[in-house]
Amino acid sequence: MFSKLKEVESRYLELEKLLSDPTVVTRQSLYQKYAKEHADLRDLVEVFRKYEKVGAAIEEAQQLLRGDDEELKEIAREELPELRQHLAGLEERLKVLLLPRDLNDDRNVFLEIRAGTGGDEAGLFVGDLFRMYARYAEMRRWKVEVISSTPSSGVGGFKEIIASIAGQGAYSQLKYESGVHRVQRVPVTEAQGRIHTSAVTVAIMPEADEVEVTIDPNDLRIDVFHSSGHGGQSVNTTDSAVRITHLPTGLVVSCQDEKSQLKNKAKALKVLRARLLDIMVKKQSDEISEARKSQVGSGDRSERIRTYNFPQGRVTDHRVGLTLYSLENILGGDIQEFIDALTAYFQAESLKQQSTG
């Protein structure tokens, strides 16, 4: 591990020289490439340098223990346990930073939220979750744009909402939100006060570049239709809404939020490209079977990653066993504690796989 860290530090120093080289500065694309690599290595190099500094302090304390000065020996005895603990923490941090980086972490994302089991309640919770993610994005100063929304009949909920979220590190922060989110609450229409359980599926997909995912126009069937709002009423009189079917995979994407057919088509193609990239990534991870379903599940209540219990004001993430009694704040976008816990959990899992592999 430490020979690898020395190599990384050497490369970091080399990049610092390159970034001050006038011949590099004048070549914008090359400069940006080196600047990004330099930024990617910064955390690792800084932690490694702290590790070396603490290691040197431990060596110095051990030398004092071998000396004759009792006062200095006492100081060294007091400092050593804390220094060793600090060193162990830095070593664990280095192991995490050396893990293979997810190349999608810096990408923008598409967020898909769909109603599963639970009827009207599931549709209402689609809206609740969308507002939660939109508020979280707002806190991060990310940009949220609704690509498509399909209202459900009756109570003002949604069958589906698709949105793009653009901002630094969007995928790295949101990628573990994919799965089934379960809600337990008493519906407004429930006269007996019984708690109902509903489910909503969330999918987080990294945005794909056109170069990465090329789509043959001959593989597409494009249909146009009238946009409709709640209850099916027409919201404009032209065929501006677009439905694109990718014939080889059967994937279907609809977009009707823009008044322009061309804009709706462009947005739908972006979502389709992200879905196709999502499938490609899963194939590379040996998760070929039912690629979309493997991320979000079927929408059945039993396949849950997180439960939102309204009567108790409780939210539990079942993957990490974390329960927070701050439902209102969480639905208001305060989800960072879950995100940090999930990131640490999956990093630990990756470390386990490396040590056993």
Swiss-Prot record:
Predominant cellular place of this UniProt entry's protein: cytoplasm
Top-level division of the source organism's lineage: Bacteria
Cell compartments where the protein resides: Cytoplasm
A single GO molecular function term of this UniProt record: translation release factor activity, codon specific
InterPro entries: PCRF, Pep_chain_release_fac_I, Pep_chain_release_fac_I_sf, Prokaryotic/Mito_RF, RF-1
Protein name according to UniProt: Peptide chain release factor 1
SUPFAM superfamilies to which the protein is assigned, alphabetical: Release factor
Gene name of the encoded protein: prfA
One matching Pfam family: RF-1
Signal peptide interval: none
Modification sites for N5-methylglutamine: Q233
